[in-house]
Amino acid sequence: MLGGELAAMIFADGPYNVPIVGHVSGLGKVRHREFAEAVGEMSAAEFTAFLRIVMRNCARFSSRGSIHYHCMDWKHTREILDAADGVYAEFKQLVVWQKDNAGMGTFYRSQHELIFVFKSGGGKHINNFGLGQTGRYRTNVWSYAGANTFRKGRAEDLAAHPTVKNLALVADAILDCSNRGDLILDPFSGSGTTLAAAHHTGRRGAAIELDPLYVDTGLRRLCATSGLTAIHADGRSFDAVAADRTRERETGND
């Protein structure tokens, strides 16, 4: 997929090993199916092993010194740190994404998510913010609206994916630790936020997604936010492929 090129930065928002139905997505009008894996069926040891495989592959297909952002909830802090041990050269920072509104929950409703920032391998990493001398004043508390904040586009985001990340949040992370033209890799594409953010910041995006539904979701979101047309490897447009596959289903052909 990468054509032999190594990614300059990773932004990963993988599953948190919690159910989507009744936990992340409520019982209202907008409902979502479960992710392909890691939706509560894994033990702590199994989830740690799952995360370690992800991280090892991220390290394998990225440049030395690259910065890797991994999103996670507070309940799985131990698993993600244990998974990273021995894979990454350094645990650079723990970022708190502070949202406008709290999500579901009973004993203190959660109004934040965590982003674990690691450095892969030796070598110098990219730091475009420093101490603010470049005009980018950055701390480890990031305040961005969550998907449930009342705003323009809220309904579309909630309908597209149960855990949509804020586009500006990901774009700022990309601006922090990569340069124009760099390749940004997302191993869990989901709603396609990283691809859209890479485009808007002058980078190139590459992403992996297991669920065909969210492959389509990510491509549609990228096209909508960028004005680009998605082209299949065989030269057909996204709409043409969709029309062909619909026709195949209707005629009973695989």
Model features per residue range: what roles?
Residues M1, L219-D254:
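S-adenosyl-L-methionine
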